[in-house]
From Swiss-Prot:
Top-rank lineage group of the source organism: Eukaryota
Alphabetized GO MF terms: GTP binding; GTPase activity
Signal sequence, start to end: none
Gene that this sequence comes from: Mtg1
GO cellular component: mitochondrial inner membrane; mitochondrial matrix; mitochondrial ribosome; mitochondrion; nucleoplasm
Subunit-level organization: Associates with the mitochondrial ribosome large subunit; the association occurs in a GTP-dependent manner.
Localisation per UniProt entry: Mitochondrion inner membrane
Domain CP-type G, residue spans: 35-208
This protein's name: Mitochondrial ribosome-associated GTPase 1
Organism per entry: Mus musculus
Cited InterPro entries: G_CP_dom, GTP-bd, GTP-bd_ortho_bundle_sf, GTPase_MTG1, P-loop_NTPase
Function: Plays a role in the regulation of the mitochondrial ribosome assembly and of translational activity. Displays mitochondrial GTPase activity.
Pfam families xrefs: MMR_HSR1 (PF01926)
Single Gene Ontology BP annotation: regulation of mitochondrial translation
Length: 326
């Protein structure tokens, strides 16, 4: 929920202009070697007619693996920005324009939960294939599409959504809220009868080197790595910083806080109190150990992240500062 800036005029000057990035080692957050997955994708390319790259619509410019275009660049390519229901797309046209400037002219926004825009995928893919040379597959009556992307952006959900739309059937690919559900290039999964289209689901593959700590934090907020590798409280702090800077104060209403605040300790303390999340801590006193009840900051941080990821804090564009001003 976006409130009028005047509502928080008294505290507006307190928002941080930058997030402290020193002391964070992004290399420790992400798996350092995913070449095995890329090699398996390459070995399957001969039987592939088109590549669908799935990415999170909340970070259209951040965290995409550049190796996808380098290794799979000879094939027609469609970028699907999924989870559009969670993203603030008021600047969608500018986002598409910037992506086009980067050479990505085929972009589609989707919501696999409600099958939004899913029906556009097969016609778009068929158009791309018709405009390209199929080499030794020219006489093959069926089409094979490879689905790639970083972890937990909805690749398997996209496959299941396509099957619902075109085959009226159930799940064929496992899905989950954590990265790493798909661990290998799967066998072909049929998603359409006419035309006859099969998809290959692939494991999420991150770039060998994350470009910056801030990009790493954005990827972490979108669930591309396990939270404990980055630290829930660090992620919650970056989320709070982002929400306040963008004037998104839905967290105030959701947790019934007295006001917006830029201090993560204060926010998590009040969230823990609201949720009745506490823990016992032993404190050494002059008369011995005493059990003291304290707010559970870790549990509060996890809930803060969960509500963001489920959309309860409103639609958010984490790449807002990268969108062209005009």
């Amino acid at each position: 929920m976006r409130l009028w800036p005047q509502a928080w005029g008294a505290v507006r000057g307190a928002w941080r202009e930058c997030f402290p990035l020193q002391g964070h080692d992004v290399a420790r957050w992400f798996p350092g070697h995913m070449a095995k997955g890329l090699k398996k994708m390459q070995s399957s390319l001969k039987s592939v007619d088109c590549v669908i790259e799935v990415h999170d619509a909340r970070i259209p410019f951040s965290g995409r693996n550049p190796l996808f275009q380098e290794l799979l660049g000879l094939k027609p390519h469609l970028l699907v920005l999924n989870k559009m229901d969670l993203a603030d797309l008021t600047e969608q046209q500018k986002i598409v324009q910037r992506l086009e400037e980067k050479g990505l002219s085929n972009v589609l926004f989707t919501n696999c939960v409600k099958d939004e825009n899913i029906k556009q995928i097969v016609p778009k893919v068929m158009e791309l294939i018709r405009c390209s040379y199929r080499y030794h597959r020219a006489e093959t009556p069926e089409y094979c599409i490879m689905v790639v992307g970083v972890p937990n952006v909805g690749k398997s959900s996209l496959i299941n959504s396509l099957r619902r739309q075109h085959l009226r059937t159930g799940k064929a690919a496992r899905v989950g809220g954590e990265p790493g559900i798909t661990r290998a290039v799967t066998s072909r999964i049929q998603v359409c009868e006419r035309p006859l289209v099969f998809l290959l689901d692939t494991p999420g593959v991150l770039a060998p080197r994350i470009e910056s700590v801030e990009t790493g934090l954005k990827l972490a907020l979108c669930g591309t790595v396990l939270d404990h590798l980055v630290g829930e409280e660090t992620m919650a702090d970056y989320l709070l910083y982002t929400l306040n800077r963008h004037g998104l104060f839905g967290y105030v209403q959701h947790y019934a806080l007295a006001s917006a605040c830029d201090q993560i300790e204060w926010v998590l303390k009040n969230v823990a109190i609201k949720l009745r999340k506490t823990r016992k801590v032993k404190v050494l006193t002059g008369t011995g150990n005493v059990n003291v009840i304290q707010p559970d900051y870790a549990m509060a941080a996890r809930d803060f992240l969960r509500t963001f990821r489920s959309g309860l804090l409103g639609q958010v564009m984490l790449d807002r500062d990268i969108i062209p001003a005009c």
